A protein has these predicted regions:
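Short, acidic, metal-binding catalytic loop of nucleotide-sugar glycosyltransferases
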Residues: 23-32
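Active-site beta-to-alpha loop of glycosyltransferases that engages the nucleotide-sugar donor
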Residues: 9-15
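A short, conserved beta-to-alpha structural element at the edge of catalytic cores
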Residues: 127-147, 257-261
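A glycosyltransferase accessory/donor-loop signature
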Residues: 1-3, 8-9, 166-315
């Protein structure tokens, strides 16, 4: 049976979604087979679906599904939450044929084979995820959620989901109910906070390279990183981490590891690229970045800035 990977996106987010999917396919072990499931706000045109399917030049995806989500979420939830976050909550109900599935945000570039994740025994745990580090405003935020251990707060952009157990405990309904309470109005990251509250104590920690968020890269945050992870984990993130653009988006301008996104974007078919306008300045910056001498100087300056910031922090 192919391994189910789920993504959610709107029609105006087809380009980032396609870029993420291409990175998943190109990084897969040749013996891996995936079932790619797209939860979309409205039906994609047949031509766009075909272009997306055409990304698989390696025969990695044995099945593609495009699920029209229009009308599946009560209108009361719109306006307060992103469409994608609401669709993600319904995954356990949408995929009754699977006991486990992997969900990814569409602002991630995958640089690892994902099939090994499906060999993890989740037991009675609900989720597998990457824990966020305690830095800055995160510290007070995580504590405000009244978790027994605030160091066990995961980023919900990359989730190994125990669908069988989630269905057993009616997790989707609990999520929707929580998001309609007064308490939820104080959540900084609504559905992510809800996942952490409801699944707390039933989460398996995944290696950080599976979901390398922005704060896993600058040296200024390394001390906080090492309170949760090891130096080997730090090296793995920087060598081959799945880059999650949790803040600045590379198609809009400069972002940490922005070139990784463009490495895949440039290989999309033109008919897909036309679905969204990307920043011309960001594209020019990428071309400079890839120029042997100029690019190396530019990268060296950014690294020096990062090092200087870290040194000043320690003084």
């Amino acid at each position: 049976m192919p391994l189910p990977i789920v993504v959610c996106y709107t029609t105006n987010f087809v380009v980032p979604a396609a870029t993420t999917l291409l990175s998943i396919i190109e990084s897969a072990d040749p013996n891996t087979t995936y079932h790619i499931i797209s939860l979309v706000e409205a039906p994609l045109s047949p031509s766009i679906e075909q272009r997306i399917k055409g990304l698989d030049k390696r025969g990695i995806v044995s099945k593609w599904s495009f699920i029209d989500m229009s009308g599946r979420v009560p209108s009361a939830y719109f306006g307060s939450f992103s469409i994608g976050s609401l669709y993600r909550i319904l995954i356990p109900k949408l995929l009754p044929e699977y006991d486990t599935a992997l969900y990814l945000d569409c602002d991630i570039i995958v640089q690892n084979d994902l099939s090994k994740l499906f060999s993890i025994d989740l037991g009675e745990n609900l989720l597998g995820g990457v824990r966020e580090t305690l830095i800055g405003a995160n510290i007070d935020h995580f504590k405000s959620l009244e978790l027994n251990d605030p160091t066990w707060y995961i980023n919900s952009g990359f989730l190994l989901m125990n669908l069988k157990e989630m269905r057993r405990v009616n997790f989707s309904k609990k999520m929707m109910d929580l998001l309609q309470t007064e308490r939820a109005k104080s959540f900084v990251f609504p559905d992510q906070d809800a996942y952490n509250i409801l699944a707390h104590g039933k989460i398996i920690s995944l290696p950080p390279y599976y979901n390398s968020i922005r704060t896993f890269y600058p040296s200024i945050y390394k001390d906080a990183f090492l309170k949760l992870y090891t130096n080997d984990d730090w090296k793995a993130v920087h060598r081959h981490g799945n880059v999650h653009y949790t803040s600045a988006k590379p198609w809009k301008g400069y972002a940490i590891q922005f070139d990784k996104w463009w490495d895949y974007y440039i290989h999309l078919p033109e008919s897909l690229k036309q679905q969204m306008e990307v920043s011309k300045k960001a594209h020019k910056l990428y071309n400079i970045w890839k120029t042997p001498i100029i690019g190396q100087i530019f990268q060296g300056l950014l690294k020096a800035k990062d090092t200087l910031t870290t040194l000043l922090k320690k003084k």
